[in-house]
């Protein structure tokens, strides 16, 4: 049956990538259909009940700055909030929250059901409708055909998923949900390059059986309680709960070693590669054999359940081994396991077969986002989903794709890494992956992206008004500090000594004083009995006020470093965005080695910058390529791309 309504964009999958994709597409005005196998699992947290962390929190803030849902949903469902690396510089500080699974799903579903231009439909997708080299719709398991001009596929771990517990295995997309076997087979027919990856989850524990008196308590930050969204308020948070800490021990490790002969990972049953930075407990014991103990965090799953998530013991060992290893740890001697841990293998597709817009190179209008691209984590999925949904909407509107640059957003780093380098293991975001991380901080994600989001149609009036007030206040206050001066005559020596350690000997602007180590914005404003404070309040809202003060202080203190980084970006920008012709045959480029020309022909980079980051492509090869383009008159910063780069929005032409 052909469904009577035709849509602009169809999103397949209702996880973190799919929900952000559907919301982004609909916000742009595209008539969007979200197809999910089960409406009750929209926004499901399949593994850890947490959002954020180092690098990941930066992505969440960027999604929020572009009008996405993840940060706001976390503020409404978060039961513990912490700022990680709080004693370090602002570039690596990151927000992390424990979320109530039920509240998080409810917050996401509420947004989906109340988003204009968005329709929901519960049916698993078995097939894609493809005509020639373009996608035209999707087919459900009962044969309903939905037509659309673009499809965003966000299948998570469901593509030919196989669950392993010991040497037992069965098909499944996650525990309790069926795998997408037919869709996986159909995608194989499309000849898209693919592979297998693996991830896992720990057993869940009944909190009533935990002896908390033997555990170390880990409270969240309480003064103040952090928020994730730039529009968030601590009053939105539900009741706050602590986490708890225990440790593995030698007995635990002996139990695990004794079970490796029945581990699917160590008997060759699992072929997929697992995440390096979220390893199973079996991997930890094997890779860090000399380590006597590993920290395990017991994280509450929610306010209305006794279920706990033991972060650190992801495993696919047989259940009897899981039970024994849990009981070997302090405080868990009598723990009751509610759900066994398991590993899951699934299909992914080589992201080097994607454009930077996340559209597949082989099939026009087909976009991939999330774990299907070889990433791991809710945050990485949500960021890709927003970008894919945005660009699917722009595709059907015949507008240029938006592809954020590496110097513009962690989202740009994520996508560039995927489409140029590919993945050999599940990809996780870290701040260390960003070469311009001093400029790509959590605190300035809105300053970097909200204006772009507004131009793209992603940001509503409420967010834009709040951002505009903040941006203008930061600018005014920064200029005031630069133009307000104190002299030895106007600043009493005792007051200067109390703040600065000694009296001043010549004239200083307040900005120059603030630039000194250990001097805060509030400290500078307190000088001269408070006369150095602004005469008018920077903001009536206390949360907005703190954001403004933070931006002013960081901007002044790190001005020199940020300006140097901006100069470096400008130097690199000339070649970074030079577009490569679609039909170029790299075998014709004089001087290129066979290996380099083969890789360039295989991966078809879109820009010189992408080409330079392909493994094996040397700086010398890039120089030869630039000479070739100049001789042939082919190298160009495509009109739209060049203009967009100068405007800072990263738009590149859509090839349709």
Curated annotation (Swiss-Prot):
NAD(+) binds at residues 274-288. Its cofactor is FAD. InterPro entries: FAD/NAD-bd_sf, GIDA_C_N, MnmG, MnmG-rel, MnmG-rel_CS, MnmG_C, MnmG_C_subdom, MnmG_C_subdom_sf. Its main location: cytoplasm. FAD binds at residues 13-18. Pfam families: GIDA (PF01134), GIDA_C_1st (PF21680), SAM_GIDA_C (PF13932). Homodimer. Heterotetramer of two MnmE and two MnmG subunits. NAD-binding protein involved in the addition of a carboxymethylaminomethyl (cmnm) group at the wobble position (U34) of certain tRNAs, forming tRNA-cmnm(5)s(2)U34. Belongs to the MnmG family. This is tRNA uridine 5-carboxymethylaminomethyl modification enzyme MnmG.
């Amino acid at each position: 049956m052909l469904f009577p309504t035709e849509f602009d964009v169809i999103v397949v999958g209702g996880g973190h990538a799919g929900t952000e994709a559907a919301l982004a597409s609909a916000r742009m005005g595209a008539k969007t259909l979200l197809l999910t196998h089960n409406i009750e699992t929209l926004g499901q947290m399949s593994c850890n009940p947490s959002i954020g962390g180092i690098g990941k929190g930066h992505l969440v803030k960027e999604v929020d700055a572009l009008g996405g849902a993840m940060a706001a949903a976390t503020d409404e469902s978060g039961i513990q909030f912490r700022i990680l690396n709080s004693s370090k510089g602002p570039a690596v500080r990151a927000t992390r929250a424990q979320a109530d699974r039920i509240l998080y799903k409810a917050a996401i579903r509420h947004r989906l059901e109340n988003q204009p231009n968005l329709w929901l439909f519960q049916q698993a997708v078995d097939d894609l409708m493809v005509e020639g080299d373009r996608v035209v719709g999707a087919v459900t398991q009962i044969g309903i055909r939905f037509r659309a001009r673009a499809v965003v596929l966000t299948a998570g771990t469901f593509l030919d998923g196989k669950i392993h517990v010991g040497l037992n295995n069965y098909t499944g997309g996650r525990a309790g949900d069926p795998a997408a076997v037919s869709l996986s087979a159909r995608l194989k027919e499309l000849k898209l390059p693919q592979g297998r990856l693996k991830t896992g989850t720990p057993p869940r524990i009944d909190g009533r059986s935990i002896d908390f008196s033997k555990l170390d308590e880990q409270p969240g930050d309480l003064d103040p309680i952090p928020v994730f969204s730039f529009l968030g308020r601590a009053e939105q948070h539900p009741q706050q709960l602590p986490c708890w800490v225990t440790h593995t021990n030698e007995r635990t490790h002996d139990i695990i070693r004794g079970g490796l002969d029945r581990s699917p990972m160590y008997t060759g049953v699992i072929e997929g590669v697992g995440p390096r930075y979220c390893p199973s407990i079996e991997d930890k014991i094997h890779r860090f054999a000399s380590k006597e103990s590993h920290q395990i965090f017991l994280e509450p799953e929610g306010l209305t359940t006794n279920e706990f998530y033991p972060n650190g013991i992801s495993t696919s060992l047989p259940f009897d081994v899981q039970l024994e290893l849990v009981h070997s740890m302090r405080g868990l001697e009598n723990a009751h396991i509610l759900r066994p841990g398991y590993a899951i293998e699934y299909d992914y597709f080589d992201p080097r077969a994607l454009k930077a817009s996340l559209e597949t190179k082989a099939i026009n209008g087909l976009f991939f986002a999330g774990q299907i691209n070889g990433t791991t984590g809710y945050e990485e999925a949500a960021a890709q989903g927003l970008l894919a949904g945005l660009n699917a909407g722009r595709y059907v509107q015949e507008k240029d794709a938006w592809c954020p640059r590496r110097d513009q957003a962690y989202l740009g780093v994520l996508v560039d890494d995927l489409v140029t380098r590919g993945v050999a293991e599940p990809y996780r975001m870290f701040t260390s992956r960003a070469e311009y991380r001093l400029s790509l901080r959590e605190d300035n994600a809105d300053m970097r992206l909200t204006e772009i989001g507004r131009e793209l149609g992603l940001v509503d009036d409420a967010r834009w008004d709040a951002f505009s007030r903040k941006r203008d206040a930061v600018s005014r206050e920064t200029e005031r500090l630069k133009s307000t001066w104190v002299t030895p005559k106007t600043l009493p020596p005792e007051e200067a000594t109390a703040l600065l350690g000694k009296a001043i000997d010549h004239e200083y602007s307040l900005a120059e004083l603030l630039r000194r180590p250990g001097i805060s914005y509030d400290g500078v404003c307190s000088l001269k009995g408070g006369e150095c404070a602004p005469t008018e309040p920077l903001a009536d809202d206390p949360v907005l006020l703190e954001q403004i003060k933070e931006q002013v202080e960081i901007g002044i203190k790190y001005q020199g470093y940020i300006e140097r980084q901006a100069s470096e970006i400008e130097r690199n920008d000339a070649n970074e965005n030079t577009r490569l012709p679609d039909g170029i045959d790299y075998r014709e480029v004089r001087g290129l080695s066979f290996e380099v020309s083969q890789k360039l022909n295989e991966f078809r980079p879109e820009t010189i910058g992408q080409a330079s980051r392909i493994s094996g492509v040397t700086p010398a090869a890039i120089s030869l390529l630039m000479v070739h383009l100049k001789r042939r008159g082919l190298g160009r910063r495509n009109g739209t791309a060049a203009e967009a780069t100068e405007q800072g929005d990263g738009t590149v032409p859509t090839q349709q």
